[in-house]
């Protein structure tokens, strides 16, 4: 498994809605994430800044990249766009983080 982490940004007046949408994640979205090799996916919120810290483990980088091309992912991004900073394709603005320490 490969560990991945990134920072995303949620609008400060949208925290509750962001959390609720993830509490009620579409079953087909959860299935697609798993089918594309996602495990142990967690998102944490810094309420002072609106920064989201996302962590997940993936089986394979290429398999994971294909998730972005799925119809359900495209719909999810579009539905989440009003809540977050996004790119022109509605994908979340995300900063990939470099792992500098790991203790098993």
UniProtKB/Swiss-Prot annotation:
Protein localization: Cytoplasm
Keyword set, alphabetical order: Carbohydrate metabolism, Cytoplasm, Isomerase, Rhamnose metabolism
A GO biological process held by the record: rhamnose catabolic process
Residues spanning the signal sequence: none
Active-site residues per Swiss-Prot or TrEMBL entry: 22
Binding site for substrate: 18, 41, 76-77
Pathway participation: Carbohydrate metabolism; L-rhamnose metabolism
GO cellular component: cytoplasm
A single GO molecular function term of this UniProt record: racemase and epimerase activity, acting on carbohydrates and derivatives
EC numbers, comma separated: 5.1.3.32
Protein family per UniProt: Belongs to the rhamnose mutarotase family.
Function: Involved in the anomeric conversion of L-rhamnose.
Assembly and binders: Homodimer.
Protein name as catalogued: L-rhamnose mutarotase
């Amino acid at each position: 498994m490969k560990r991945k982490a990134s920072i995303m940004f949620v609008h400060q007046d949208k925290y509750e809605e962001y959390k609720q949408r993830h509490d009620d994640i579409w079953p087909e979205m959860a299935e697609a994430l798993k089918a594309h090799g996602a495990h142990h996916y967690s998102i944490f919120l810094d309420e002072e800044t609106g920064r989201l810290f996302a962590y997940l483990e993936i089986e394979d980088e290429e398999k994971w990249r294909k998730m972005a091309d799925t119809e359900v992912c495209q719909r999810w991004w579009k539905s989440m766009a009003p809540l977050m900073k996004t790119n022109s394709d509605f994908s979340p603005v995300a900063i990939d983080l470099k792992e500098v320490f790991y203790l098993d």
